[in-house]
């Protein structure tokens, strides 16, 4: 939980930034911008302050060795740790369950929680694979992350047609994962 004094200090910092950028703080359109910006950043980084969602498991009721479970194109939003600009992600996950399977919504919530923080996509993909292996109690995991980074989409090289794709695997799971580009901007 963020204290009121910390929020006030953050809002003042945004006011200073807006003035630095040349904005007129008396303009009606930006009257509440510092408050809105701080609230938006708190939402985008909630994974830093909130515990991970609890995962509910359902027992497998058959004797056969279960095949892999694949969940493709989970939409999540993160922010670049270098520029604090949004990264729109599509995350695909495959895992080999052990003796029970987690609820589908819990896997999706776990991915969205993990993304809700400043990240570098390459490191995030590795961490997410470790996190899912542990939290899903899986025998093996494969993760594929496709990201559109606003730091190179709207500034710098200004290339709206690229996406970054990263993959990580824990164990011997050999599954092809699809991962669509998160934004189609043609």
Predicted segments, located by residue:
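A domain-level signal for the structural core that forms small-molecule/cofactor-binding pockets
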Residues: 1-186
């Amino acid at each position: 939980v963020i204290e009121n004094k910390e929020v006030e200090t953050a809002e003042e910092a945004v006011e200073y930034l807006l003035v630095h950028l040349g904005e007129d703080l008396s303009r009606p359109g930006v009257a509440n911008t510092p408050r809105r910006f701080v609230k938006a950043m708190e939402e985008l980084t909630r994974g830093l302050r909130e515990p991970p969602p609890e995962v509910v498991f359902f027992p497998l009721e058959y004797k056969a060795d279960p095949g892999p479970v694949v969940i493709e194109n989970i939409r999540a939003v993160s922010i670049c740790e270098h520029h604090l600009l949004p990264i729109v992600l599509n995350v695909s996950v495959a895992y080999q369950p052990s003796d029970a399977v987690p609820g589908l919504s819990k896997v999706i919530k776990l991915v969205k929680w993990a993304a809700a923080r400043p990240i570098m996509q390459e490191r995030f993909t590795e961490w997410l694979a470790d996190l899912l292996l542990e939290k899903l109690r899986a025998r093996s995991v494969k993760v594929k992350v496709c990201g559109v980074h606003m730091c190179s989409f709207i500034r710098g090289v200004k290339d709206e047609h690229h996406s970054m794709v990263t993959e990580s695997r824990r164990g011997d799971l050999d599954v092809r994962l699809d991962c669509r580009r998160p934004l189609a901007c043609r």
